[in-house]
Amino acid sequence: MITSALLFLALLPNHQIAPQTIDRKALVDRHNVVLTEFDGARPLQVGNGEFAFGMDITGLQTFAPFNTMAQWGWHSSPLPVGKRIEDFNGQVWDTHGRPVRYPMPDPANPEVSFWMSANPHKINLGRVGLLMTKADGSAVLPSDLKRTTQTLDLWAGVVTSRFELEGNPVTVKTACHPTTDALAVQVISPLIKLGRISAFLSCPGDNPRYFANHVGELNSPATLETLRAEGNRVDLVRKLDATSYHIGLQWSGKASFGPVPESLNLPIQIVKAEYGAAKQWADVTYIVSKAITNNRLAIRVNSDNLVPDPAVGLGKLLRVTYSIGSQAQVVEANEGEFMVIEPSAFGKRLQLVPARDADSLAFTCTFTPKRLPSNLPTVESAFDSSRKGWASYWQTGGAIDLSGSKDPRWRELERRIVLSQYLMKVNASGSFPPQESGLVNNGWYGKFHMEMIWWHKAHYALWNRWPEVEPSLEIYRKLIKNSVALAQSQGYKGARWPKAIGPDLHEWPHEIHALLIWQQPHPIFLAELDYRAHPTRATWQKWAPIVEATADFMASYAHLNPTIKKYDLGPPMVVVSENTNAKITRNPTYELGYWRFGLRTAQNWRRLGGLPPKSEWDRVLKNLAPLPTQDGQYKTYEGIPDMWTKFTYEHPALIGAYGMLPGDGVDRPTMARTFDKVAKTWDFERTWGWDFPMLAMCAARLGKPEQAIDFLLHTSSGFQFDARGLATGGPFPYFPSNGGLLYAVAMMAKGWDGSSNGNAPGFPKNGQWRVRWEDLSPAP
């Protein structure tokens, strides 16, 4: 019998090989990140979901002012003098013959409207780097470091950075404590005995920018107040208007802590300046050097002030390496912004100097919004906890191993899968939904977007990593009071969920935010994923009020069209692609499909709880407008003009109705024709990162697995993964790309409701792919 069973398995095609035990450590280790060059724009990170630290090639923030960010790290600037939040009134738009007030910029109160947009904003908690000098006492530049190698041990969450300075080896180990917002650092080098290496701590000033790779104002560093200085520990507090937080520094061995000597009178030296984008850069060192006046650089970044456009059609930036005395750093500014460099950028730095007889410098730096605890993590305990925490993460939840595949693309796809799991744990597993760039930098002032919660969080359900998703789903319970009030103020029932918010839970005034609707069914989808994993009364009770309020709004939002006796969605409304006229947009394909899924699922939730179905939900569900078609294909919305000539850019969301969603209201042959048309005509250089997993999921459901793989490895510049796993697809980095990839591959490996029983139904069945997986759940 055993022999017969083995023979049967041996005769199965490769794609049907049953799941086997995966060597998870080997799977993860083969994708450890190895870097060999300095990059002032893209950090490597350590973090725990609540807190993250971005580093340059030195293992710290020595040259590049990367960010230290936390879920709790927000600040609100004071309101303009004489202004009040209560003065804000938004705008009134006609909505099916009713005047409805929306949270849009208030023409009568532009200052308050802008303040509400920019506040609260995420802040950079601090910068930790190395201070190094050459033998002659001059500043060390990135180019002075030789034999640079930086390795991220994914299984341990530890980064080891090695380099040589004038022939002297330096090794820096960096990690983050898994449950405390603490950075652990160990530096080993003979330069310590020579007094040529130490560590610094500084905090940039506040500068709420719409987008910022380097967050904060470097030229206005904060003053840190010392609360405690005893033995090998210093407790500091930073105060910023009404915001304050604490920093605790604890070190091993002998060291002294104090201010770095000021360099305010030393000249600024421009070492290198380049202007451009992608691979098109112009050397502007001479021009930038000549722009220094009275030892201060202030220059607007544009082609008029620098050189003729070196990268036509691309958003450019100015990147400058400069030194002041024995200190150096690399800064950048986007096109249209001012770059300002002043000697004060190195002011107010605090320095940890190891004793001259020491062999190493080891310390932890802990950040907290409250007073520091009596015991801070030691270096040893932080590294040990990191190793144990990451090993536990990798050994729980799902895994996908593609190493037996013949298609040479398997390694790159598997690399993206593994690195995305690391990055999403670091950036998107905390107590709040992440912003789209996670804890790397700031986009849209750092606010999180509620329509993106699906792309950031849904994959955790398919990978059975519920500890990484459950804390942030509390956002719906926190929001329900405000959301019910918003719906009522607009004449609707239930809860209207916002689009872009911060921890104050107030909508950022904006036309798109006020009219977007595709985030509305998300909590029903997420509740369904939770119940599928945890089919208990407790799960039902947890989600029932949210599902009920969500569906109540969805049913009351739909408007009965008296002419055709069908329920319309919009206008006014903003669709997923955000590129149509909100005042005429009606009945978009994706939103109609999601409305059907949401109302159908909500009715089923009532049945699960022993409640009768709601008649008003049924009435809307049964009479909702059909998904719009023309020439046998779906359209973005009903009546859209020139669909395939003017609107083949931004999100091809109509595909999502049968991919991301299970296809309520979808005719499969019509969707197949639509998919083929999109694949042939869409401008994939003008899309976003999560569009490609969405297309892959649609391809998988349509029985086009080869195209599903092609979309997950598409050549578009909007869906690329760098050596760290950081993805393009929006303002860089763009984590919906990573989250979408993880959802899509899990669905393709495990399957979805109604998919074939074979292994990996979404992967090609051509003998080129051998897919092994563990502990995945199917998609709806």
Describe each PLM feature range.
Residues 61, 82, 449-482, 502-506, ...:
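Active-site core of glycosidic bond-cleaving carbohydrate-active enzymes
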